Swiss-Prot record:
Predominant place of localization: mitochondrion
Described function: Component of the ubiquinol-cytochrome c reductase complex (complex III or cytochrome b-c1 complex) that is part of the mitochondrial respiratory chain. The b-c1 complex mediates electron transfer from ubiquinol to cytochrome c. Contributes to the generation of a proton gradient across the mitochondrial membrane that is then used for ATP synthesis.
GO biological process terms held by the UniProt record: mitochondrial electron transport, ubiquinol to cytochrome c
Additional comment: Heme 1 (or BL or b562) is low-potential and absorbs at about 562 nm, and heme 2 (or BH or b566) is high-potential and absorbs at about 566 nm.
A cellular component term, taken from the record's GO annotations: mitochondrial inner membrane
Binding-site list for a ubiquinone: 202
Organism: Passer montanus (Eurasian tree sparrow)
InterPro entries: Cyt_b/b6_C, Cyt_b/b6_C_sf, Cyt_b/b6_N, Cytb/b6-like_sf, Cytochrome_b, Cytochrome_b_C_euk/bac, Cytochrome_b_N_euk/bac, Di-haem_cyt_TM
The keyword Heme is assigned to this record: yes
Assembly notes: The cytochrome bc1 complex contains 11 subunits: 3 respiratory subunits (MT-CYB, CYC1 and UQCRFS1), 2 core proteins (UQCRC1 and UQCRC2) and 6 low-molecular weight proteins (UQCRH/QCR6, UQCRB/QCR7, UQCRQ/QCR8, UQCR10/QCR9, UQCR11/QCR10 and a cleavage product of UQCRFS1). This cytochrome bc1 complex then forms a dimer.
Location(s) in or outside the cell: Mitochondrion inner membrane
The protein, known as: Cytochrome b
Transmembrane annotation, as ranges: 34-54, 78-99, 114-134, 179-199, 227-247, 289-309, 321-341, 348-368
Length: 380
């Protein structure tokens, strides 16, 4: 009898066990599609990024012009650039939905998978930040100046650290060249972390909407979920291509069409939309170090979610109080995103402070208390 190559070849059997014969719960919903969508985002970003890097020049005098040249003179350069810029937005949409799914259905109880996932989020944020600096427009320059300056809030070593990161006494040519090097390198770190993330996931198997073990009732990943994933790919790529072709600058800042000028500060410095919620938390604290700590805590708080799980249920499917809190948290993050895009003046300051307070209160206090109350009400 001929050996089945797919199951016996050293490399093919790894792929087979991860993508073809993988035992999968039969009831996972479309919320479980976002992991594979993130994989597609990563591949498309690396491919478009590589093509852009072939034409980009990491020099303060030439960076802006090289991007303009790409859009004017390179075959489909405008399309590659628009796909790359908007692909970043889709990457963040998918990762936020993926994290939201994890919080709702208790996927964070796979602790290793969850912790690697949070590290992936931090790496993605770093990659997007250094990438935004590369076109060397006004918002690129001032965004880099403001965000790197936050490190100066670290006691004793802060100022030295910032000047070390800048490679001088301000954001200049050395900063741009090292940011380009980092922007090229970090996606490959993300690929490596993704493989670790998947390895830990396949140790325990996927969670499911009911939050109960499904070991007794699994189906193969292929053809059921391969087809389902391909549908997700088609829908997401259709949306990405539509945005890149019809409204490529919708999510960008018009300020970035002006070349960087250290002598002119834009009236309102703000990051890309996917960082606005964290930016609003940073701004809501009138102390520099306090703001930086709150900014870090807004993401690092995700590491604590497995420790704060007090419910006897894994998923929120049968927990109405926790569901209300979860959707309040979603609304809260949307409010923070909106406030982050507004100028620092009367109504927005207090709204931002209240939203920041409620963000941490919901995650750190109300979620565990609601779960304890539900345990009592359901006599668990």
């Amino acid at each position: 009898m001929a050996l089945n190559l797919r199951k016996n070849h050293q490399i093919l059997k790894v792929i087979n066990n991860a993508l073809i014969d993988l035992p999968t719960p039969p009831n996972i919903s479309t919320w479980w599609n976002f992991g594979s969508l993130l994989g597609i985002c990563l591949i498309s970003q690396i491919v478009t990024g590589l093509l852009l890097a072939m034409h980009y020049t990491a020099d303060t005098n030439l960076a802006f012009s090289s991007v303009a040249h790409m859009c004017r003179d390179v075959q489909f350069g405008w399309l590659i650039r628009n796909l790359h810029a908007n692909g970043a937005s889709f990457f963040f949409i998918c990762i936020y939905l993926h994290i939201g799914r994890g919080l709702y259905y208790g996927s964070y109880l796979n602790k290793e998978t969850w912790n690697i996932g949070v590290i992936l989020l931090l790496t993605l944020m770093a990659t997007a930040f250094v990438g935004y600096v590369l076109p060397w427009g006004q918002m690129s320059f001032w965004g880099a100046t403001v965000i790197t300056n936050l490190f100066s809030a670290i006691p004793y070593i802060g100022q030295t650290l910032v000047e070390w990161a800048w490679g001088g006494f301000s954001v200049d040519n050395p900063t741009l060249t090292r940011f380009f090097a980092l922007h090229f390198l970090l996606p490959f770190l993300i690929v490596g972390l993704t493989l670790v993330h998947l390895t830990f996931l396949h140790e325990t198997g996927s969670n499911n909407p009911l939050g109960i073990p499904s070991d007794c009732d699994k189906i193969p990943f292929h053809p059921y979920y391969t087809v389902k994933d391909i549908l997700g790919f088609v829908l997401m790529l259709s949306l990405l291509v539509s945005l890149a072709l019809f409204s490529p600058n919708l999510l960008g800042d018009p300020e970035n069409f002006t070349p960087a000028n250290p002598l002119v500060t834009p009236p309102h410095i703000k990051p890309e939309w996917y960082f606005l919620f964290a930016y609003a938390i940073l701004r809501s604290i009138p102390n520099k170090l306090g703001g930086v700590l709150a900014l870090a805590a807004s993401i690092l708080v995700l590491f604590l979610t497995p420790l704060l799980h007090t419910s006897k249920f894994r998923s929120m499917t049968f927990r109405p109080l926790s569901q209300i809190l979860f959707w309040a948290l979603v609304a809260n993050v949307l409010v923070l995103t909106w406030v982050g895009s507004q100028p620092v003046e009367h109504p927005f300051i207090i709204i931002g402070q209240l939203a920041s307070l409620s963000y941490f209160t919901i995650i750190l206090v109300l979620f565990p208390l609601a779960a304890i109350l539900e345990n009592k009400l359901l006599k668990l």
